[in-house]
Amino acid sequence: MGAEKCPDSVYAAFAEAAPGGVLCEGYGVTECSPVISVNRPESVLPGTIGQPLPSVRVAVVSAEGEPRRVAPGETGMLLVSGPNVFGGYLGVDADKQPFVAFEGTEWYRTGDLVSEAADGCLTFRGRLKRFVKVGGEMISLPQIESVLAAAFGGGSSEESGEQGPALAVESGEDGAIVLFTTLDITREEANAALRAARLSGLFAVARVQKLASIPVLGTGKTDYKALKASCA
């Protein structure tokens, strides 16, 4: 249960430790007490975060401009309403609270991108702040990381384990995509790997920065704030 996609390495480790067991991935945030959705043991769909809990309402809407519902299967911003949603941050002005009015209801704006199947099952697509708009298209930085980690080894920030990530992707203020890596990878090699993965030409690394190590937080996750600062 968490606010990030469960890494494939966790599924593999669970299958080895508990043969025949069922791993029920779910999703939640502190502001929603914290569970929003979860896979049921009798109907697990690996790679998804399941369906909303009873009494929890969700809406998947356009990430920019006035909210509008997106079609089933399309990626959009996740809104949540229900008795589990908190009342707001203490000491924060009302106009800075993470709520939005939509279809006559006040919703909590999660900042997360998901897609919703026709049966209501949700799939986590990433944090909005980990996307960059290029040529009018929302480009997933984690998707670029995943492709490059698979192509060059060393693991991404989610899969790296104790040795730390070998690469990470961030964008500068100008939207340029930067690959930070401890490996010897050229920009041409990185972009060739993205093309081989059949990603559109908008998924392109503008430059590569070699580092002795990728900065990480105390949680072991990549410190993207530090990387973004170095993009400036």
Positions of predicted regions on the chain:
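AMP-binding/adenylate-forming catalytic core of the ANL superfamily
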Residues: G82, G87-G88, G104-E106, G111-F203, ...
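Gly/Ser/Thr-rich phosphate-binding loop
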Residues: M1-L45, R57, P67
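Active-site glycine-centered loops adjacent to acidic/histidine catalytic or metal-binding residues
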Residues: A3, G28, G50, D112, ...
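Short proline/glycine- and acidic-rich turn/helix-capping motifs at secondary-structure junctions
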Residues: R207-T219
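Conserved ATP/PPi-binding loop(s) of AMP-dependent carboxylate-activating enzymes
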Residues: Q51-S55, E66-V100, E137-I139
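Short Gly/Pro-enriched turn/cap motifs at secondary-structure boundaries
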Residues: G47-P52, G104-T105
